């Protein structure tokens, strides 16, 4: 007689504005295992931690995740980059580099860039430390709430933030997985670039209102961001 399939569930709730990979990592730590073990339980030998999971998974793997999750389909989808990128690039292709999304430079479980954090956000007493979706977006350089610059590397050892290497010994996403430094102890950097912050605020406004303005004329969100990219490319060319 065959044994019935064991039922188990991810009970960790997705936090406000949390990104998909952060939720999976915290879910693994909450049940007492590494992200690698949880990923294998969900999807077998698929090397999910060697890619940019925040871009999403295919329908079959998404269904497998839903069958073991207490979260709704909509809430999980909202934690993926597609929930933002689809507004500025309708022909969204998760297999390609996406404009405005910081590339992780992934190799095995390591990433050479793309993970930014606000150290004050990690200190919240109301929620466990978690990574925000908007920290992966290219125009985000500062935390508006705390008026701090985001950091993308450990101030102690200088290595880029590597959340996929989190394990039980680290306990949460606020710990550098390379040297063990608690990022919540980092001295805040208040040296904010005001021009960059102004652009960040304007981009957020366009994204929220789903309309922008160029030369005093209304344009779609997609067109506004295309124009912004063109101007930024021109500025970089002139500076270099």
Q: Language-model features: where?
A:
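Domain-exit/linker segments immediately C-terminal to small folded modules
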Residues: 144, 148-240
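A structured, charge-rich N-terminal accessory region that forms the first stable segment of a protein
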Residues: 1-114, 119-125, 129, 198-199, ...
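Residues immediately within or flanking Cys/His clusters that coordinate Zn2+
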Residues: 115-118, 137-140, 151, 173
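Catalytic micro-motifs at enzyme active sites that drive phosphoryl/nucleotidyl and oxygen chemistry
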Residues: 104-108, 126-134, 139-144, 162-166
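Short alpha-helical "patches" and their helix-cap loops
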Residues: 37-45, 135, 157-163
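A structural signal for short, well-ordered beta-strand segments and their strand-loop junctions
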Residues: 38-39, 117-120, 142-144, 153-156
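Aromatic-residue detector
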Residues: 25, 37-38, 131, 138-139, ...
